[in-house]
Curated annotation (Swiss-Prot):
Purpose of the protein: One of the primary rRNA binding proteins, it binds directly near the 3'-end of the 23S rRNA, where it nucleates assembly of the 50S subunit.
HAMAP family: Ribosomal_uL3_B
Alphabetical GO biological process terms: translation
Subunit composition and interactions: Part of the 50S ribosomal subunit. Forms a cluster with proteins L14 and L19.
Alphabetized PROSITE patterns for the sequence: RIBOSOMAL_L3
Protein name: Large ribosomal subunit protein uL3
Species name: Mycoplasma genitalium (strain ATCC 33530 / DSM 19775 / NCTC 10195 / G37) (Mycoplasmoides genitalium)
Gene: rplC
Length: 257
């Protein structure tokens, strides 16, 4: 399977309308051109892959190993280095844009990291049931309960691996399959992808060819929005007060008295 992919940054979500008045939720991904920083082959590395670098930064912001890596290959320094397996056919140093890899309506798989929620209990992490809140239930209303496998006899006197317990929740790699490309914004370097993508705003996103719907393209036509220019009204003429030097005779009489 010919694999094509590009890395970007999640900006946020919005919505867009088609010609059939269908409202599509979309995720906006900022995708600047990815640079081919390395090529791996079966003959040398036992597998095919393409190493991509993205998000341009000043060379001083990189550590010494990355500075040496880019200076040795005489490439533009980037903050991130990521590898995509089974991606072939690109020359070293080439800049890849999303318009070169995908078409509007093409199905893609999007990989990203979910939001990190820190150390949480079993109720939030695994959707366990809350304990009874009354009738002498005592203090542990939100505890996970017993974790042992059994009591004596032939039952195992240990806790099995993979037992659902309290622990670190979130910050896991998730792939959303069978989304499709809605559109491109070449000026602002944006890619519009249908549906929701896991992770926070500013998280790294990988857009790759769909594994299940390979080569399939969805027929999509967006509604063209026409905006009428506002009609400017002529400003109203302000009435100017004419100052006169005439003196009121009553005021002068009061002053003389």
């Amino acid at each position: 399977m010919d694999v094509r992919g590009i890395f970007g940054v999640k900006v946020g979500m919005s919505q867009i309308f088609t010609e059939q008045n269908e409202c599509l939720p979309i995720t906006i991904v900022y995708c600047e051109a990815n640079q081919v920083a390395g090529i791996k082959t079966i003959a040398k590395d036992n597998y095919n892959a393409t190493l991509l670098s993205f998000q341009t930064v000043d060379e001083k912001q990189l550590n010494k190993p990355k500075q040496g890596f880019f200076s040795k290959l005489k490439l533009e320094p980037h903050k991130y280095l990521r590898e995509i397996r089974k991606m072939q056919g690109f020359e070293l140093g080439k800049k890849i844009t999303p318009q070169e890899l995908f078409k509007i309506g093409e199905y893609v798989d999007v990989t990203s990291l979910t939001k990190g929620r820190g150390f949480t209990g079993a109720i939030k992490r695994w959707n366990f049931k809350i304990g009874p809140l009354g009738h002498g239930a005592g203090y542990p209303h939100r505890f996970q309960g017993s974790v042992q496998a059994g009591r004596g006899g032939s039952s195992a006197q240990r806790v099995f691996k993979g037992k659902k317990m309290s622990g670190h929740y979130g910050h896991e790699q998730v792939t959303i399959q069978n989304l499709f490309i809605v559109g491109f914004d070449e000026i602002n370097k944006l890619v519009l992808v249908s549906g929701a993508i896991a992770g926070p705003e500013g998280g790294i996103v990988l857009i790759k060819t769909a594994k299940k719907k390979t080569g399939k393209i969805k027929d999509i036509k967006l509604a063209v929005q026409t905006v009428k220019a506002p009609q400017l009204k002529a400003p109203k003429k302000q009435k100017t007060k004419v100052e006169t030097n005439q003196v009121n005779p009553k005021i002068e009489e009061e002053k003389t008295k």
